[in-house]
Every structure is written in C-alpha cells, then in structure tokens.
Amino acid sequence: MAGFEIIEIPSLEDGRIDIEALKAVVDDTVALMMVTNPNTLGLFENDISDASDIIHSVGGQMYYDGANFNAILGRTSPGLMGFDAVHFNLHKTFSQPHGGGGPGSGPIGVKGHLAEFLPGPIVKKRPIVGDEAKFAVDEMWYGWYQPANSIGKVQQWHGNSGAVIRCWAYYRRYGYGLKDMSEHAVLNANYLRHALHREAKNAGVEDMFVDGANTHVAKHEFTLSLQPAKEKYGISAMDVAKGLLDQGYMAPTVYFPLVVPECMMFEPTETESRDTLDQFAKDFIKVLQQDAETLHEAPITTPVRRVDEVYAARNLCLRHPFDDE
C-alpha cells in the first residue's frame, strides 16, 4: 500500500515481541508499527513502551489493533502504551453481535497530532446559531467539520452507525463497571485454562494437548496445541472443534494464531458462569476421549454435517440460484 513494504517482527520464545529484532529493522523509512496488545496468544506485551519509543525515535507512528482491548479495559489505555491511532472492535469489547460477517464496526481514534488527517467530514461540536437554541441541551450544537488535511470521504465513512450508538449506550450504562467486566474476562480465561488441564489429568488424557504459550497467567484468551493428539491418535484441532458442536457449543477458533501447531483459541469472555466453564471443560475432555474415526465424522447431531470448507472457500456461492439459472 502506497509503496510501503510490510515487515513481520518475530516473537521470542515466550511469545512476545523480539525488541532486538525490531531495532534491527527500524530506520527513518518506517511509517508505523501495528500491534495487538495483549497479543493473540493472550499475552500482554510487557515491552510495548520500549517498542513505541523505538518507532517514535525515527518519526514513525504506533497503530493499535483493538481486537483484544477487552482484556485491559479500565486498567490501561492505548494512549498510555504509546499508540497514536487505534481501531476499536465493537463486536469484541462493546457488546456488538458478530456473526455471519457482521454487523462489525471498528471506529478509529487518534491522538491530537493526527486529528486533522482523519477522513471527513466528521461530527464536531460548534457554537449555537439562531433557532438552534430551542433544541440544544447545552451551549453547543453539533455540525459537520472537514479536517484541514483530510482526504475526504472514504468508503463506509461513518461505518455502522447503529453499532456505534449501541456501543455508546453500553458504555454509558456500565461506566466504571467495564473495568470489572474486563477483569472477569481475564479471570474466566485463566479459570477455564486450568480447568481443562485439571479435567485432562483426571481423565488420563493430559498427553493430548499442551499450552500454546509458556505462561502462568494469560489475559482474556489462551491457546492450546492439539499437536500431541494428532501425532499420537490422528485427532486434529478441527476434529475436536466439530466434536464440540455435537456437545452444543460454538467451537473455539482453530488454526489461529499460526505460530501454534493444531491451535485452538479459547475466549470465554466475562459473561460465562463458573458452572458453564466447568461443564465445558468436562465436555471438552469427553470429546478428546472419543475414537478418531468418530471425530472424523463429527458433527453428527447438527442439521448440517461437516462441510468441505476448502471447497467452499474456493467456490464461492454468494446467493441462492434461481430455478431458471
């Protein structure tokens, strides 16, 4: 994009940014660095301030992917970590539904030095003019504002306005309680992680998976590698995910992040009860105890059986065909 090259910064053994590797590639041609914190392994980037200082030292900007903001809400902020711009995933932190491709919404926020570069027009407060005083609830009114260095409108320039309003209502309703929600999301993830290991040990199947990251405490999500199960029993992460559908669960994300072989990613969120987490852990182990041939056929009880996902991805059918086509 715009003639820039994307450079991937490797991780250390603990799953976090390799600061020395970052230093080795940074020069005055760097435009920005994009980071998710906590990262997709569920680990907080402890050296994020150092990374920000390195990028800023050459005039670059820091961009925050808000995908995992639910883990730190009320505890810290992208600004404190040194980020200059951020997009918030409203479907992951602020109550928006996210199924079937939408309605996703990712509002972008920037620090003051970038405000005049935002796409426009944007809504901004301005003094009241004329009869507007009859409708105003304070001494200001809202109007359109075109930032001085804006490129103007871009596609979907105001995004999904309904999602934004719902987010605002959610934020206003819970206020400081959002911090508690974040803490419960982290607590639930760590509780489930340890519950899975406990149930696996009790059932004698602890040799079927390992942690995706070497850490004592994760944030709002964690990963497991089913590589041992695949090597010993021919059971893949996809098989286990399909088996969980038969148990009545929405399956965890599989094969992401890519750095974890046969990866399953668990993000229980703050809304699940302890009883639900305990039952899920038991049912997960129940799936692991099934024979490989049974799991290869899963799901069995759902209205739609296992689909050929590779074929579906390569042969898109975006609408139902009419009879005369």
Q: Could you tell me what each predicted segment is?
A:
Residues 206-247, 258, 262-279:
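Conserved PLP-binding catalytic core of the aspartate aminotransferase-like
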Residues 13, 39, 173-177, 228-230, ...:
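A generic structural motif
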Residues 79, 85-227:
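Active-site C-terminal subdomain of aminotransferase-like
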Residues 24, 46-57, 187, 191, ...:
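Alpha-helical scaffolding segments of alpha/beta enzyme cores, especially the outer helices
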